[in-house]
């Protein structure tokens, strides 16, 4: 089995960002299967949340972050949550030097909620936090399934922006 600490491997962190909770999923070579890794509490600010995520990115030697982007159903509108996600993306790129991909996450939380409620029969209280983790897994899976094979062979990631 591969060693996730090997910096030459392509590793992915999927993030379902929320203002209270953040769901996380992870994938690494050789299989690139999206696995849920849990849910964390968001920081009081986007900057505080970026610091929390920085530690996870470093700990898991992540080379690419797939950050769920809640694109509104009606074009032309940008939500406050999207503004935070754009800021978080920039902070992660600047502090970690990893590639961040904003990925359409429309309805991922609703799909996760249906899965947990219908298939698993979990109560609302037991679904808390699990929905975010499953949504992160769905976001990362969607990205991995739609990506060309060459992305998995890429050994290096973009350098952080020069200040």
Curated annotation (Swiss-Prot):
PANTHER family in UniProt: POLYNUCLEOTIDYL TRANSFERASE, RIBONUCLEASE H-LIKE SUPERFAMILY PROTEIN (PTHR33317:SF4)
Source species: Chlamydia caviae (strain ATCC VR-813 / DSM 19441 / 03DC25 / GPIC) (Chlamydophila caviae)
Protein's name according to its UniProt entry: Putative pre-16S rRNA nuclease
CDD domains the record matches: YqgF (cd16964)
Enzyme class, spelled out: hydrolase
Gene3D superfamilies: YqgF/RNase H-like domain
Lineage: Bacteria, Pseudomonadati, Chlamydiota, Chlamydiia, Chlamydiales
Family named by the database record: Belongs to the YqgF nuclease family.
Pfam families: RuvX
Highest taxon above the source species: Bacteria
Ribosomal protein in keyword set: no
CC per GO annotation: cytosol
Matching NCBIfam families: RNAse_H_YqgF (TIGR00250)
Stated role: Could be a nuclease involved in processing of the 5'-end of pre-16S rRNA.
UniProt xrefs under SMART domains: YqgFc
GO MF term (any one): nuclease activity
